[in-house]
């Protein structure tokens, strides 16, 4: 993959407000698709697409835990800009009202209730 293609994937991952919201939530704790869908109030397919883009760009990874597939911030990204950007996002958008509300919802969302619907 060319360097410009890598750059495009990196910046595309950051170009959507819902992907930024997902990154902030995953900085707080690991989540499954159902939990993210519940907080964002988006279709599961839309959330899955956002997760795929973030995964391809190296921001997140999947971790299987029994029947759950959890999404977490990539602890060892191959691109050093990923960690730097996540730290910058903490500074830039942490005081955003929507982000604050998302993080409050993340604390009370119950995967056992919502994933069995």
Kindly give the residue locations of the regions a language model identified:
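N-terminal helix-turn-helix DNA-binding core of bacterial DNA-binding proteins
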Residues: 5-46, 52, 68-78
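A general structural signal for well-ordered secondary-structure junctions
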Residues: 17-20, 32, 60, 99, ...
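Beta-hairpin "wing" of winged helix-turn-helix
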Residues: 56-65, 72-73
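Amphipathic alpha-helical dimerization/coiled-coil segments
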Residues: 78-117
């Amino acid at each position: 993959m060319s360097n410009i293609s890598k750059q495009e994937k990196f910046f595309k991952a950051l170009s959507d407000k819902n992907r930024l919201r997902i990154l902030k939530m995953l900085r707080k704790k690991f989540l499954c698709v159902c939990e993210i869908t519940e907080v964002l109030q988006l279709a599961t397919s839309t959330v899955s697409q956002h997760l795929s883009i973030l995964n391809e760009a190296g921001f997140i990874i999947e971790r299987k835990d029994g029947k759950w597939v959890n999404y977490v911030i990539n602890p060892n990204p191959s691109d050093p800009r990923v960690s730097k950007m996540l730290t910058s996002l903490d500074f830039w958008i942490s005081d955003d009202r929507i982000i604050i509300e998302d993080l409050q919802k993340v604390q009370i969302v119950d995967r056992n209730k919502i994933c069995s619907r």
